[in-house]
Amino acid sequence: MSFKTNAVPDEVIELLINVRPVIEKIGGVYLAGGTALSLFLGHRVSIDLDFFTPNDFLATPLSQDLNQLGPYVPIDVKNNSLVCKVKEVQFSLFKYGYPLICPLEYYSNISIASLRDIAAMKIGAIGDRGARKDFYDLYAILNYTSIKIEDILKDVCAKFSIPEDSLYHYIKALIFFQESRKEPDIKPLIKMNVQWEDIESFFCKLAPTLIQ
C-alpha cells in the first residue's frame, strides 16, 4: 500500500509514529477516521488522530504515558474513552466493539483500518450526525477508489449487524444536510477540486438510486 502524507501535517505524522509504543500496551489498536483516510487518498488536510480498539483500557495509565510525549491537555478522560491533545494534536482512543471487515493496513508499523472499514464507519457517522468532513470523505472514497456505494452498504450491514431493510436510515442521511450546513465550510482543507454544493448535488443524485 502506498500512503500519501502530503495532506497530513508533519506534527501529526510525528505523533502518529511516537505514540506507537504507548498504544501497543493496550493491544488491538488501529487508526481510522479522517487522518487514516487522508493517508490513503490525500484528499483533505486532517489534523487529529482517531484510534480504536476492541479491548478495555484504563484511562489513567494511558494519560500518564501520553503526557511523556509532550505538552498534554486532557479533554475527556475516562476508561475505554480518552480524548486529549498532545503537542496541540488531538488524540482520541475509544473502545469499539464492531468487527473489522478487511485486514488492517500498516504505516510505519501503525495499524490502519482498511478503506472498506473506514467507508462503513463514515456511513455510520453520517447516519449519526452528518458532519461536513464525513460527506467530503465519503465523496472521496466513491470518486477516487473502486469501492461502490452498494458494497459499502453491505459492509455497514455486516459491520454493525443490521438487516438490509434498516439501511433506509443511512440512505436518507446521505441527503440530510441541515446540520452540516450550519458548520463552517472546510474547503480550505480540501485537496479535491470540488465545492460543498457539488457534494450535496452528488449525494442528492446518488441516494434515490439506492432506494428499491
Residues covered by each model-derived region:
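Compositionally biased terminal segments of proteins
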Residues: 1-212
